[in-house]
Amino acid sequence: MVIDMNIKEVHDSWKEKGFPYYPTDTKWRNDIFNQLVNFKRDTLIDRKNKVIGQSAHGLNLAWSYMPHAWGIKCGKMKTPMEIWEDEEHLSKGLNKILSGTFFMKKPAHMITESDMRSMLRRYSGTQMVSNFRPTAAAAMYDIFVDKDSPLEGTVAGTVWDPSMGLGS
């Protein structure tokens, strides 16, 4: 392991900060929502091959409403929250970031909340529930939901979307 003292300091520092949940403040959520709304969804649609591509835009916003997702079991795999709560596994994960094993090497002072979330999700033997990509959902709405158009005689449709998130 990279200098054990360094790992202990980083471990203790992150424990003091708390679990690296996504932000929940209104300004952050509004900024991310605006990025999602302004994303060029047509770039995801391949009509010839009938494929809707993927983009991570808006996933962080969706996860910000579901902090409980970090502790939901997927089969027999560990949850990211179990890694966070286990001193040995959390220290091993931090070591992988500090040493550049599996993750991009970073000095302790440059480890971000995003790095921590990534490590907790990808730690060996761990799985996190997945979420439907908001951009893919929006692209499907663009294709299948009528728009208000006096010219075409259509009225804006209503969407009932049971895939709108993990929920509680």
Residue ranges, per PLM feature:
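N-terminal accessory regions of S-adenosyl-L-methionine
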Residues: M1-V129
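Long amphipathic N-terminal alpha/beta scaffold segment
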Residues: S124-N131, A137, G153
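Conserved S-adenosyl-L-methionine
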Residues: A137-S168
